[in-house]
């Protein structure tokens, strides 16, 4: 109650005419994190619901926690396994002392030894993920608050989701300055220039990642960025399949084959939050149950992916192993599951109409497989498929609405 009274006592300073009027957006953002805003309608409302934009965004934020925690554990585990595979004794100690992530982990009570437990793996993974997330949150939050102050309206809570989604779809070794550049592009160019939350036609997190992919490909793709171990090089499972098919899927540290269950659980290198389809399904179940994410879009993505991957399986190829990848492997490799559950279902950049959502999802699933199979330079296709579908979402809605209008006119004889 003391906090609420304090906020109420200083509120008048941020209202129009107050000495801190220009900082109202920042005050409102902090106050509404803890308490419901006092703004009410002056007429009877048509729909009464305790869930507002802030609560919806917070639920999505919580929904990615399973993937986030597993991603930190997996990133730490992959790094520890690789380090102990390459180095031993004094050489390992030298490597640890030369990397602040490693020595910070040991200083906080963790260990980089081969027998490191869950806590040490989680701790090491956190030293990679949390700085990226903090950088993205602070830099992106700065731009969000700046635009809100200029436009004189409250801070939109959509950035809570954008920041964590962006941090989860990049490699654990991404330089912090590149993370800052990527989120700057996503927030400013893909969102704020078009009017802010609710007016952007591209997914800001994906737009930021696409910017980094084309501007700095060496730090966000290739074989050396996915495992946070100095001097280690290892391709992702999707890249391995693109090179040699199912038989080429091996753990780059132990040399043992990668099974479908390994990929489903997330015991493979990759972007921090994209590796575990199981963890992503848990989070997706939350937002689908709460009707935040559209099940029609998710079903459409699956239908498009299964149909096109099956078509390529039937066609076959002796020179391109990706033609032979079954749909259930497409599901668990790369960023497909993350994109399907948390990116494609973005309510702003996706289609609004029910029929439009089906076609929007089908286009994403089909395009993802086509890019993975046909494009020889880039085995991943989910990011580009969703951004491509974002451009078509308004067209799908326009066609559906026009057809509904014509159907109603014909029904009533006009």
Swiss-Prot record:
User: What molecular functions are annotated in GO for this chain?
Assistant: FMN binding; oxidoreductase activity, acting on NAD(P)H, quinone or similar compound as acceptor
Q: Where are the transmembrane segments?
A: 56-76, 129-149, 164-184, 268-288, 297-317, 325-345, 358-378, 381-401
Q: Cross-referenced Pfam families, in alphabetical order?
A: NQR2_RnfD_RnfE
The UniProt entry's GO CC annotations, sorted and at most eight, read: plasma membrane
Alphabetical list of InterPro entries matching this protein: NqrB, NqrB/RnfD
Q: Which UniProt keywords apply?
A: Cell inner membrane, Cell membrane, Flavoprotein, FMN, Ion transport, Membrane, NAD, Phosphoprotein, Sodium, Sodium transport, Translocase, Transmembrane, Transmembrane helix, Transport, Ubiquinone
Give the reaction(s) catalysed.
a ubiquinone + n Na(+)(in) + NADH + H(+) = a ubiquinol + n Na(+)(out) + NAD(+)
Q: Where is this chain's protein located in or outside the cell? A: Cell inner membrane
Enzyme Commission (EC) number: 7.2.1.1
| Cofactor(s) this protein requires | FMN
The primary site where this protein sits is membrane
By its UniProt entry, which PANTHER family does this protein fall under?
ELECTRON TRANSPORT COMPLEX PROTEIN RNFD (PTHR30578), NA(+)-TRANSLOCATING NADH-QUINONE REDUCTASE SUBUNIT B (PTHR30578:SF1)
> Tell me, what does this protein do in biology?
NQR complex catalyzes the reduction of ubiquinone-1 to ubiquinol by two successive reactions, coupled with the transport of Na(+) ions from the cytoplasm to the periplasm. NqrA to NqrE are probably involved in the second step, the conversion of ubisemiquinone to ubiquinol.
- Subunit structure, briefly? Composed of six subunits; NqrA, NqrB, NqrC, NqrD, NqrE and NqrF.
Task: Note the NCBIfam families from the entry.
Answer: nqrB (TIGR01937), PRK05349.1 (NF003756)
In its UniProt entry, what is this protein called?
A: Na(+)-translocating NADH-quinone reductase subunit B
What is the native source organism of this protein? Answer: Vibrio alginolyticus
> Gene encoding it?
nqrB
């Amino acid at each position: 109650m003391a906090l609420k009274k304090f906020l109420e006592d200083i509120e008048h300073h941020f209202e129009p005419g107050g000495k801190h009027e220009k900082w109202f957006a920042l005050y409102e953002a902090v106050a509404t994190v803890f308490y419901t805003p006092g703004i009410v309608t002056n007429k009877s409302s048509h729909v009464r619901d305790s869930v507002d934009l802030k609560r919806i965004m917070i639920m999505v934020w919580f929904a990615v926690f399973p993937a986030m925690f597993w991603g930190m554990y997996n990133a730490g585990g992959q790094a520890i396994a690789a380090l102990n595979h390459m180095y031993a004794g004094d050489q390992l100690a030298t490597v640890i002392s030369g990397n602040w992530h490693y020595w910070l982990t040991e200083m906080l009570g963790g260990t980089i030894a081969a027998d490191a437990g869950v806590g040490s793996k989680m701790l090491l993974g956190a030293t990679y993920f949390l700085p990226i997330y903090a950088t993205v949150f602070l830099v992106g939050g700065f731009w969000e608050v700046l635009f809100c102050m200029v436009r004189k309206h409250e801070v939109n809570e959509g950035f809570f989701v954008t920041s964590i989604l962006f941090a989860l779809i990049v490699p654990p070794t991404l330089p912090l300055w590149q993370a800052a550049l990527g989120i700057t592009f996503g927030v400013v160019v893909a969102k704020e220039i078009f009017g802010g939350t609710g007016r952007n036609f591209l997914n800001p997190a994906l737009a930021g990642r696409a910017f980094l992919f084309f501007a700095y490909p060496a730090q966000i793709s290739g074989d050396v960025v996915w495992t946070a171990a100095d001097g280690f090089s290892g391709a992702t499972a999707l890249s391995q399949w693109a090179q040699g098919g199912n038989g080429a899927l091996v753990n780059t540290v132990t040399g043992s084959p990668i099974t479908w269950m390994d990929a489903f659980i997330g015991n493979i290198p990759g972007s921090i939050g994209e590796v575990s389809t199981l963890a992503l399904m848990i989070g997706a179940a939350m937002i689908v149950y709460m009707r935040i994410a559209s099940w029609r879009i998710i079903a459409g993505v699956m239908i498009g992916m299964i149909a096109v991957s099956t078509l390529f399986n039937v066609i076959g190829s002796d020179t391109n192993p990706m033609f032979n990848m079954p749909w259930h492997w497409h599901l668990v490799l790369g960023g497909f599951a993350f994109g399907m559950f948390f990116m494609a279902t973005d309510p702003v950049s996706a289609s609004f109409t029910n029929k439009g959502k089906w076609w929007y999802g089908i286009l994403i699933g089909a395009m993802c497989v086509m890019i993975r199979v046909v494009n020889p330079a880039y085995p991943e296709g989910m990011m580009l498929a969703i951004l491509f579908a974002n451009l078509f979402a308004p067209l799908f809605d326009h066609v559906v609405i026009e057809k509904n209008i014509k159907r109603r006119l014909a029904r009533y004889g006009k």
